[in-house]
């Protein structure tokens, strides 16, 4: 009889395992993580008060939360360079995953329009991926400093090989052998001369979340990482990831139907942020106007608008960062219709449905602009 209260005391004194503390950098990433964690917990969003993902930095309260986090999912330094140093100095409990360098991630070079994978693997079977996981080794004690050690021999989409050792600190080397998709092989866009860049993105376009294929790859990875830190809920993470992947497949088919009539139709953009979306849905690469970086439209941009008008182009895709006065100047006296799009979906409520709504909004805006 004496053992019973002793056992009860032991049970009472044993703390229950807390739900993993998870942080995501941008609203679309947060949405994907939230989908996988649904029914278990809620991730924390860093970009929670507007602003730009390119200039995202940690507030003191966020830095404290990051120190206590179990998992941090972010795009990587190509998108938010100010986060790299803080993430490198986090405590040993914080496991940082840069999604842009995750295996299987499709990458588009800023001087190109065709995606290639970020490794040399055979590709992902998204039906089985959440269950079977990635074919790569994790050293979780050193992941925040050294990243994943990936050894991938080949992949189905003929990308290029990456050495991912220490990618969180040192970046990665690319061997650009070939490109996966051929949706845009009829146009050559030299963005150093003909386009512009709101931000110095470097050699690779960081807007990787706008590829639904990348989202599916990441959902499986997110489930795997969560399961390793919280094995008691592994089945829930796996089931949620599979359901989210299936939903993206359904959404992708719907968007393909919506945008099929506009394949190859040309348009202008104040900033070429939607290359991944364009490539996946066979849209012509945007003709990015020169020198518009949130400021006034210069003579060259106006000349490009005039030439576009002569070619019968009537669609202009612009972003919230572009001033309304600039847009008015660009469209005045022309047949151009400006349509605003936010690649981050900051006008959409954060949560599990944000990513789906973001892609739906982009598709609807393109269809309306290109009609």
Give the ranges of each region predicted by the language model:
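Extracytoplasmic metal-acquisition and chelation regions
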Residues: 19-371
């Amino acid at each position: 009889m004496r053992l019973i209260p002793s056992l009860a005391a032991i049970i009472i004194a044993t703390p229950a395992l807390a739900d993993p503390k998870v942080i995501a950098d941008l609203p679309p990433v947060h949405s994907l993580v939230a989908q996988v964690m649904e029914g278990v917990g809620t991730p924390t969003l860093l970009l929670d008060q507007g602003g730009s993902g390119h200039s995202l930095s940690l507030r003191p309260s966020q830095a404290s939360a990051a120190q206590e986090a179990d998992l941090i999912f972010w795009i990587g330094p190509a998108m938010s360079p100010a986060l790299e140093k803080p993430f490198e100095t986090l405590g040993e409990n914080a496991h940082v995953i840069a999604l842009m360098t995750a295996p299987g991630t499709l990458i588009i070079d800023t001087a190109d329009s065709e995606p290639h994978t970020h490794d040399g693997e055979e590709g992902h079977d998204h039906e089985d991926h959440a269950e079977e996981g990635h074919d790569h080794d994790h050293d979780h004690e050193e992941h925040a400093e050294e990243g994943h050690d990936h050894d991938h021999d080949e992949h189905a989409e003929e990308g290029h090989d990456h050495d991912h050792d220490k990618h969180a600190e040192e970046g990665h080397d690319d061997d650009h052998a070939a490109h996966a998709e051929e949706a845009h092989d009829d146009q050559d866009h030299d963005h150093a001369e003909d386009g512009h860049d709101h931000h110095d993105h470097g050699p690779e376009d960081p807007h990787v979340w706008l590829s639904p294929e990348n989202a599916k790859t990441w959902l499986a990875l997110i489930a795997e990482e969560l399961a390793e830190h919280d094995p008691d809920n592994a089945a829930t993470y796996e089931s949620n990831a599979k359901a989210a992947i299936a939903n993206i497949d359904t959404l992708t088919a719907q968007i393909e139907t919506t945008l099929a009539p506009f394949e190859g139709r040309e348009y202008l953009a104040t900033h070429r942020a939607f290359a991944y979306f364009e490539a996946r849905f066979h849209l012509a690469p945007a003709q990015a106007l020169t020198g518009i970086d949130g400021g006034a439209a210069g003579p060259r941009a106006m000349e490009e608008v005039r030439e576009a008008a002569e070619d019968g182009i009537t669609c202009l895709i612009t972003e919230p960062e572009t001033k309304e006065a600039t847009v008015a100047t660009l469209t005045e006296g022309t047949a151009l219709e400006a349509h605003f799009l936010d690649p981050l979906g900051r006008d959409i409520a954060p949560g599990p449905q944000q990513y789906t709504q973001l892609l739906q909004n982009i598709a609807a805006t393109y269809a309306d602009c290109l009609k």
